[in-house]
């Protein structure tokens, strides 16, 4: 958290943000719905070092989408659920077309940069996947819906229905190479 605080102070107090903040803020649909997350374990974060960042000036022509699925819990996400995800759910998701890129849990530390408020007191597990477009995502959703065996066990852990966010990468996002 100290590194996060330093980085945010340097960025938001720096000349680049000051010069471009109005334009940047106008592109953000919702910047108030923020969860503070950390990788579920050391190897569950994004592996961006394998991605190549597109060159400046590249167009945002990809039809691919990234999907963030948020699972809500009554209590902090425990090792039992993470084991279930890794042993049962992750392979099943991959088999029906949703390779898991990364997965995270709630960071329970206090928000050390109050200028950027975060939602507190929530317990979540968030996993990310990529699809070649909306049709590929719909194919996955149809295929996964047929796995009633997993749905029952998954739902036994959850506080409520998952929240699904469909995202588009910016033209120079490192996620484009995934």
Model-derived regions, located:
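Surface-exposed interaction/gating patches
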Residues: 41-115, 120-134, 171-178
């Amino acid at each position: 958290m100290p590194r996060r605080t330093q980085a945010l102070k340097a960025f938001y107090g720096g000349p680049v943000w000051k010069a471009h903040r109005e334009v940047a803020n106008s592109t953000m649909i919702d910047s108030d719905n923020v969860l503070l997350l950390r990788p579920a374990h050391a190897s569950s974060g994004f592996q961006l070092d394998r991605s190549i960042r597109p060159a400046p000036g590249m167009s945002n022509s990809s039809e691919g989408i990234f999907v963030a699925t948020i699972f809500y819990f009554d209590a902090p996400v425990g090792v039992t659920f993470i084991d279930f995800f890794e042993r049962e759910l992750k392979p099943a998701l991959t088999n029906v077309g949703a390779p898991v890129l990364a997965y995270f849990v709630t960071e329970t530390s206090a928000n050390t940069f109050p200028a950027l408020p975060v939602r507190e007191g929530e317990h979540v597990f968030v996993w990310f996947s990529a699809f070649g477009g909306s049709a590929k995502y719909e194919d996955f959703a149809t295929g996964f819906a047929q796995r009633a065996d997993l749905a029952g066990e998954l739902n036994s852990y959850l506080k409520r229905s998952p929240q699904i966010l469909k995202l588009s990468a910016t033209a120079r996002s490192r996620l484009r190479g995934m």
